[in-house]
């Protein structure tokens, strides 16, 4: 196969080091995929240039194998409207060569992402009634449209699509982490139940699309999360649902420019995106995708309208939502209670789906609408953090 730089009649060795793309680092101690990297091309990279670059990458695959790097090469390719890139296993010499391509914007290690759940215990649900009553109450008040005609992409650990809570409205979309179309942690099923379950859900008529990116330990590589976002955008576009879709990511990890950039593409495409702020009681600015300013980043509140002790905070937070002792669906049937910002984010996704159906707003305008409806009721929200609590605008 003819190499990319042979086609263009010059070689990598001839490139000036001043053109080298930045190789980003991750915080000390962060868990990463061994020799795993994410490569993001510059915004002005044409489809032709990207294709040629991939041809060149394929041509050096055998060289990496000969150097003893087993399983080397490109694993995932990303082709968003405004983001082109790929991820894979590469040795140090290859990464240096890649970074010297003037079309490459940056390279970063492929860090491990985790779900944002902290505890499980059995207690009665309260989140639905709280988000539909300004001053609290026992009943969930909502319009009968209930998210009808809206799709909810749950980018998580999988979903038990046969659970009675979903009434046949849940389907498998894509599995990007293993070959098991099941929810090994219960996390994704719980999240989906909060968004669209018949009993525990907010948008009770919305369709759930399971996009599995986390394994049975609740972990997955950043590259897989980006692939899940890419798949969701393409799937929604194919079905004409971009502006009638919500995408929830109750997960996070160390800061990733690539993940933030990919997440922003979903909003640019027309979708609503909710993400969890994190459970370390720190400023969420250092986490991804929570630090991406265009997404709806959700912190966790308690039954008494306080900040949950574990919840992250900071200027990246858009809203608080119920995230303590939340009852929802469990794989195999039945229910379970979980706490975490992982439980707060799907409340926002559910209300967004509800408002998209009820008011006809496009998905990428829903976060603004949520903030317009929200109430400034959270006590001690944290430094430089909003005090606004999610509300569905029921009038109660």
From Swiss-Prot:
It is found in: Secreted. It comes from Trichophyton verrucosum (Cattle ringworm fungus). Secreted subtilisin-like serine protease with keratinolytic activity that contributes to pathogenicity. This is Subtilisin-like protease 5. GO terms for biological process: proteolysis. Pfam families: Inhibitor_I9, Peptidase_S8. Keywords: Glycoprotein, Hydrolase, Protease, Secreted, Serine protease, Signal, Virulence, Zymogen. Residues 376-389 have a biased composition (Polar residues). Residues 37-113 form the Inhibitor I9 domain. GO terms for cellular component: extracellular region. It is an enzyme of class 3 (hydrolase). Residues 1-20 form the signal peptide. Its EC number is 3.4.21.-. The active site is at residues 156, 187, 342. Glycans are attached at residues 63, 230, 248, 392. PANTHER family: ALKALINE PROTEASE 1-RELATED (PTHR43806:SF58), PEPTIDASE S8 (PTHR43806). Residues 21-116 form a propeptide. The keyword rRNA processing does not apply. The gene is SUB5. The keyword Metal-binding does not apply. Residues 125-396 form the Peptidase S8 domain. InterPro entries: PCSK9_ProteinaseK-like, Peptidase_S8/S53_dom, Peptidase_S8/S53_dom_sf, Peptidase_S8_Asp-AS, Peptidase_S8_His-AS, Peptidase_S8_Ser-AS, Peptidase_S8_subtilisin-like, Peptidase_S8_subtilisin-rel. Residues 376-396 are annotated as: Disordered. Gene3D superfamilies: Peptidase S8 propeptide/proteinase inhibitor I9, Peptidase S8/S53 domain. Belongs to the peptidase S8 family. GO terms for molecular function: serine-type endopeptidase activity.
